[in-house]
Amino acid sequence: FGDIDSGVWPEHPSFADLGNLDAPPAPAGGGSRECNYGDNPLTPAVDVFACQNKLIGGAHFTDFYDSFVGDDPTAGTARDSNGHGTHTASTSAGNIVDHAVVQGVDRGRIQGLAPGAWVMEYKVCGPGGCYPVDVTRAVEQAILDGVDVINYSISGGDQPFTDPVELAFLDAYAANVVVSASAGNSGPGAQTADHLSPWTITVGASTQDRMWLTDLNLTAGNGDTYTVEGTSIVGEGIDSPLPVVMAGSTPGYNDTLCLTPAPPGLFEGKIVACERGPNRVLKGFNVMQGGAEGMILYNPSL
């Protein structure tokens, strides 16, 4: 299984070698698969990840991104810098993990769609996005590495016969590689799906009836009220009114995207409103460092 995304965090339990998989076959194109995850930033120069019989390789194809944008703290490796690739790869082919703990709450068993698959990660995206020239190189390498399935959970174009990424997927199809691509985050109106190529499996979101819902009640200084339905994955809720502050208007912080850690105590006893953008998990973690009781993620275009 080849995941083309923002990289993975290789120490994640979803990619641990549990001893239940044989060594993978040699790449179809000969040679050996690249394994470049670099040092673990938590223990630099001490813990260098070595590929094994679950996560069998990792390569980065971000040369254009790094030269054009250059904001990736894990540049030059296949290590994930924003969590998206770790999420998509584990959803597709992550191990069975019996106790998935989120903020101290045991959420039970999780697993990917194909927990018995070998995983190869191809990093093509940085914090600011992805570029077709990097993606096409990764697709061609995945073909040479002998992957059976490519997952590409990233938006794309709607012109399959001229889009370079879609044409790279056509090469994969010709090499008997199944490509699964996301339909994107637009919609649900007509003509809002991405990856319309007839040679890909394009996957859209679906719904189910399991929900844990709560209401968010906002009261302005003039007494106006507004209630929105929200969701929470934490075990303990907020059971009393708290002030809501805008991250970008808070003295001593002024980061609308909440991408920098807040000073201790800055948001004590408050709910912080952060603008949507890269890495919503990191946003929550950063405001939590400042003592925030909760976070609201808002879309500035609505």
Predicted regions and their residues:
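Short hydrophobic alpha-helical runs that function as membrane-insertion/retention elements
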Residues: 179-181, 204, 294-298
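Active-site environment of divalent metal-dependent phosphoester hydrolases
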Residues: 186-190, 281
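Subtilisin-like serine protease catalytic core
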Residues: 1-131, 145-148, 160, 174-176, ...
